[in-house]
Amino acid sequence: MKIACDIPVSEVMSFPVIKATKNMSIYDIANIMTENNIGAVVIVENNKPIGIVTERDIVKRVVSKNLKPKDVLAEEVMSKKIITIPQNASITEAAKIMATHGIKRLPVVKDGELVGIVTQSDIVRVSPELLEIVIEYASITPEEKEVISLDTDEFSEEYINGICENCGYQGRVRLYQGRYLCDECIEEFEEKEE
């Protein structure tokens, strides 16, 4: 019998994943979310995840700027620094990644291709005790633990538990150009610099 924390994400993930292409309008994406009662759509190219559009992305990047959803494409709104998890990783690993990066869902991949999606709710439903572990893990400072490696140097920066000085998000933030910001706000600033 498997201990709940050792369960692979492939056993709790949702599949098939509701996905879209980067050329779809935000209007169509929002309708897909509504029809399927979901909070995010994974954007794929050749079945490989290249981004994710969340409800928060739509509110921050379309609604709050008074843009017309039919005129805005997914590629303009999606979070491009998508964090994925291998299907054989444990739900504990998934929970730690979510806590570290302040995200609620992780696309699950096999050989780089999208095979499912795992959410905080999926994990807590199977292993409620992980909720406490995740909260505790999120509050540990980088000095007290190793920074999680995600097979890329891109995410090796040190995070702290705090408040984003741009949007007010509470969770994992990191120093960026003299301010503590969440990953989504950092991505927005980097896009503006390009």
Curated annotation (Swiss-Prot):
Residues holding Zn(2+): C164, C167, C182, C185
GO MF terms, alphabetically ordered: metal ion binding
Pfam families listed in its UniProt record: CBS
SMART domains registered for this protein in UniProt: CBS
SUPFAM superfamilies: CBS-domain pair (SSF54631)
InterPro entries in the cross-refs: ACP_MB, CBS_dom, CBS_dom_sf, Diverse_CBS-Domain
Name of the protein: Uncharacterized protein MJ0653
